[in-house]
Regions:
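Residues on the lipid-exposed face of transmembrane beta-strands in outer-membrane beta-barrel proteins
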Residues: 16-18, 36-42, 65-69, 78, ...
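Glycine/small-residue-rich loop that forms an oxyanion/phosphate-binding "nest" at active or ligand-binding sites
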Residues: 61-69, 74-99
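Outer-membrane beta-barrel transmembrane domain signature
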Residues: 44, 109-193
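Residues that define the transmembrane beta-barrel architecture of outer-membrane proteins
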Residues: 10, 30-34, 41, 59-63, ...
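Cleavable N-terminal export/targeting peptides
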Residues: 1-11
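Surface-exposed strand-loop-strand hairpins of Gram-negative outer-membrane beta-barrel proteins
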Residues: 23-34, 53
Length: 197
C-alpha cells in the first residue's frame, strides 16, 4: 500500500507462504514451494529479501534482493534475481548467467496500477539475432472487493523479442492473465492467517 506520508520509524516484516505452484509472469517455475521473505522500510525506502524453494528437485530455486522507494502512488526499485534449477544449475557467485538485475517503475492510480520492468545487467535475455534484448515486462492490475474478498485482476506482457520470458517471445506477447482472491482470517489480536488463490 502506498501513502503520501512516509513512516517516521523503521518498520520490519517477516513471513513465509506455502504455495501449491509457483508461476511468475506467465512462467511455470515449480510446484509446491515455500516462499519466505523479510523486509525493512523507512520513509518510503525499502530493502527486502524473498525466496522460493520447491519441494521437487526440478523446481526453480530463487533468491531476490530488492531496494525500492515509494512516494504517493509512484514506485521505483532495483532487484537482483538469482535463479537456479536442476536443468540449469548455477552458483550464486555467477553474476553474468545466474543473476538478473532489473529496474522497476510503477504508478498506482488507485483503481488501476501500471508497472514496467526491464533487465539491465546479468542475464538480460537475447533476441532472435543473439544480441542482448534487455527483456522487459509490463503489467496493469486492478484491485477490487466483492463478497467480502479482496480481488486483483492483472494482465502482463512482454513488449519485444527476447528469450528471458516463456522460453522465447518473437515480439509483443501477452504472457500472464490472472485473477487473485485473498482474505485474512483473524486468529488472535496479533496474528492473522492470509489465504489467497
Amino acid at each position: 500500500a502506498s501513502g503520501v506520508k512516509a513512516q517516521d520509524k523503521v518498520e520490519a516484516s517477516v513471513g513465509a507462504d506455502l504455495v501449491s505452484g509457483y508461476i511468475w509472469r506467465g512462467q511455470d517455475l515449480g510446484g509446491v514451494s515455500i516462499q519466505p521473505g523479510a523486509g525493512l522500510s523507512y520513509k518510503g525506502f525499502s530493502l527486502s529479501a524473498w525466496g522460493s524453494v520447491g519441494f521437487e528437485g526440478t523446481d526453480t530455486k530463487e533468491l531476490d534482493l530488492t531496494l525500492g522507494y515509494e512516494y504517493g502512488g509512484f514506485s521505483v526499485g532495483v532487484t537482483d534475481y538469482w535463479f537456479t534449477s536442476a536443468d540449469s544449475p548455477a552458483r550464486y557467485s555467477d553474476y553474468k548467467d545466474a543473476h538478473t538485475f532489473e529496474v522497476a517503475l510503477g504508478y498506482d492510480f488507485g483503481p488501476v496500477a501500471v508497472n514496467w520492468f526491464t533487465n539491465f545487467a546479468g542475464s538480460v535475455g537475447v533476441n532472435e539475432d543473439g544480441k542482448d534484448a534487455y527483456a522487459s515486462y509490463f503489467s496493469v492490475s486492478a484491485p477490487f472487493s466483492l463478497g467480502g474478498i479482496d480481488w486483483t485482476a492483472e494482465i502482463g506482457a512482454t513488449p519485444w523479442a527476447n528469450d528471458f520470458y516463456n522460453g522465447y517471445s518473437n515480439g509483443f506477447k501477452v504472457s500472464a492473465i490472472s485473477l487473485q482472491a485473498s482474505k485474512e482470517i483473524k486468529i488472535t489480536d496479533s496474528f492473522s492467517l492470509p489465504l489467497w488463490a
